[in-house]
Curated annotation (Swiss-Prot):
Note: A protein of the expected size has been detected by antibody binding and Western blot in at least one of the analyzed tissues or cells.
Compositional bias (Basic and acidic residues): 320-331
Gene coding for it: IGSF5
Family recorded in the similarity comment: Belongs to the immunoglobulin superfamily.
Designated name of the protein: Immunoglobulin superfamily member 5
Length: 407
């Protein structure tokens, strides 16, 4: 009994040695191909990040004595390489071979990669459990958009220009290239909260000349670059032109706005503008700068047709009123005389009331004293209205008084 136990204890170290030897033999079998020759994967492929539409390259280095190298994409064999020639099943997957220091290097090239090609890349030997693997990432460059292709701004006036990168696999670095003179410029980047693959870059500047603005999106790791350019036109603010139209300024700004006129068209347009402005300015000066007003309206009496008509009607009405007034006075004086009035007495009265025509004295002083100031005639007084009653008196002869009728 004790001897049996002793023999069991003595055999335990032999069991451990057997396990170690079995593990070593299993590892050696793993790196041996079907023909029994030993080989291994010395260096497997490396991770790669490429752009959509470009090429992806992977290298796998194995020891001498290999029989078959298999390349798999997402656990699907896409390329097989034999010592003499590759076995190509898809034209998008090709192979290159190199000998380096007694080892063999196989290179797999994936042409025109697509986002669906992203996944695990594996290089393995036939009947071998050891392999090398890597991961392929395909990046997609999205759109780069500036809302306006041609911008027109005022000189020395601040403005903002936006650039929109959208549908990128990951957001790029945004920068601006200025092809014009500016007094100030700055930009900032604002990601879109609702879309992690989109963002907005805003450029604030104060332009001083015409030029271009370029929004640049880059992936430094891939050395990829995409840009969008916009033309910026600066318009000089006119000085004080009195509210007129600056025809030369308008013509000079047409090419920058995308319009082009021949020489004869520019000359004709300038002449047409001048011919249009000349009568406009003339009418403005005559009608707006005249200080005289008439008829209670706010227009010039010399150039307004309606005021001319009203003025003519007023003059005709005034002449007609004066004529009627004179006729009424004449009729009133003739109708107010008494029928018993003697014409001889009237003649005597008229003769007696006349002033002397000349001075008969030869002495100048006496002549001057006798020649007093001329008598004012009674008919030089301003006429009275025809509506008031009138009375005529004969003051020539105090002895004879004519009867007078008061109307």
């Amino acid at each position: 009994m004790g001897q049996k136990e002793r023999s069991t204890a003595d055999t335990l170290p032999d069991l451990e040695e057997w396990k170690s030897a079995a593990g070593l033999r299993w590892w050696q079998t793993a790196v041996v191909d079907g023909s029994g020759s030993g080989n291994e994967v010395i260096e497997g492929p490396q991770n790669a990040r490429v752009l959509k539409g470009s090429q992806a390259r992977f290298n796998c280095t194995v020891s001498q004595g290999w029989k078959l190298i298999m390349w798999a994409l997402s656990d699907m064999v896409v390329l097989s390489v034999r010592p003499m020639e590759p076995i190509i099943t898809n034209d998008r997957f090709t192979s290159q071979r190199y000998d380096q220091g007694g080892n063999f290097t196989s290179e797999m090239i994936i042409h025109n990669v697509e986002p669906s090609d992203s996944g695990n890349i594996r290089c393995s030997l036939q009947n071998s459990r050891l392999h090398g693997s890597a991961y392929l990432t395909v990046q997609v460059m999205g759109e780069l958009f500036i809302p306006s292709v041609n911008l027109v701004v005022a000189e020395n006036e601040p403005c903002e220009v936006t650039c929109l990168p959208s549908h990128w696999t990951r957001l790029p670095d945004i920068s601006w290239e200025l092809g014009l003179l500016v007094s100030h410029s700055s930009y900032y980047f604002v990601p879109e909260p609702s879309d992690l693959q989109s963002a907005v870059s805003i450029l604030a500047l104060t332009p001083q000349s015409n030029g271009t603005l370029t929004c640049v999106a880059t992936w430094k790791s891939l050395k990829a670059r995409k840009s969008a350019t916009v033309n910026l036109t600066v318009i000089r603010c006119p000085q004080d032109t009195g509210g007129g139209i600056n025809i030369p300024g308008v013509l000079s700004s047409l090419p920058s706005l995308g319009f082009s006129l021949p020489t004869w068209g520019k000359v004709g347009l300038g002449l047409a503008g001048t011919m249009l402005l000349t009568p406009t300015c003339t009418l403005t000066i005559r009608c707006c700068c005249c200080r005289r007003r008439c008829c209670g309206c706010n227009c010039c009496c010399r150039c307004c047709f309606c005021c001319r008509r009203k003025r003519g009607f007023r003059i005709q009405f005034q002449k007609k009123s004066e004529k009627e007034k004179t006729n009424k006075e004449t009729e009133t004086e003739s109708g107010n005389e008494n029928s018993g009035y003697n014409s001889d007495e009237q003649k005597t009265t008229d003769t007696a009331s006349l002033p002397p025509k000349s001075c008969e004295s030869s002495d100048p002083e006496q002549r001057n004293s006798s020649c007093g100031p001329p008598h004012q005639r009674a008919d030089q007084r301003p006429p009275r209205p025809a509506s008031h009653p009138q009375a005529s008196f004969n003051l020539a002869s105090p002895e004879k008084v004519s009867n007078t009728t008061v109307v």
